[in-house]
Amino acid sequence: MNQPIGNIYIVVAPSGAGKTSLVAALLQAEPSVELSISYSTRQARKGEIDGQHYHFIDRAAFEEMKDRGDFLEWAEVYGNCYGTSAPWIRGRLEAGRDILLEIDWQGAEQVRKVFPDAIGIFIAPPSIEELERRLRGRDTDTEEVILRRLASARAEIDKIAEYDYIVVNDDFERARLDLISIVRAQRLRSAPQCRRLADMFRRMGTAGAK
């Protein structure tokens, strides 16, 4: 079986760093990249749509999927479980699709054990002070939750060297372009390009067809 052409992009960021908005902007600019929809046991928030934001399931169904080995990765965060469908990911990669996973650092470590070539991208805030300002500006969390998120952010930033790319979200437009550039550059790497363009090189009668 030929190595799948598709790439896996893992995007990780502390809460409040702007990951969700940046990922949405990337998907709009690069519609060929498919977002993996995670399964979650938490309650849907206002405006969230089942199957679009998450696949919302109860704890028993989640445990059943986990026991079957259906999750490429899973984690429990603040009492709620989140998981990524392994069959869906493998099917899309084998079809040559690029997949984006918007997950936490625990999930990223699990995915890279299975797919060591997965591309890790960390979205960093310009400072902890700015991150705190953004978290407080959302006006959705208690003081306890904000402090817990800030502590988690420091722990995540400690692992920043494990990622392939670091995007600092101090200016949204610049960060958006940085994220798009990563995806476009990865597609132009020699190995995947040789597979995609094998027929073209073969017609040229060149070694690029190998």
Swiss-Prot record:
Key words, A-Z: ATP-binding, Cytoplasm, Kinase, Nucleotide-binding, Transferase
Biological function: Essential for recycling GMP and indirectly, cGMP.
Domain of life: Bacteria
Main localisation: cytoplasm
CDD domains linked: GMPK (cd00071)
SUPFAM superfamilies for this protein: P-loop containing nucleoside triphosphate hydrolases (SSF52540)
GO cellular component: cytosol
Gene3D superfamilies, alphabetized: Guanylate Kinase phosphate binding domain, P-loop containing nucleotide triphosphate hydrolases
Family statement: Belongs to the guanylate kinase family.
Localization (cell): Cytoplasm
Enzyme's top EC category: transferase
Entry's EC annotation: 2.7.4.8
NCBIfam families: guanyl_kin
Protein name as annotated: Guanylate kinase
SS bond partners: none
Sites where the protein binds ATP: 13-20
Protein species of origin: Chromobacterium violaceum (strain ATCC 12472 / DSM 30191 / JCM 1249 / CCUG 213 / NBRC 12614 / NCIMB 9131 / NCTC 9757 / MK)
Residues covered by the Guanylate kinase-like domain: 6-184
Catalytic activity: GMP + ATP = GDP + ADP
Listed GO MF terms: ATP binding; guanylate kinase activity
This protein's record includes keyword Cytoplasm: yes
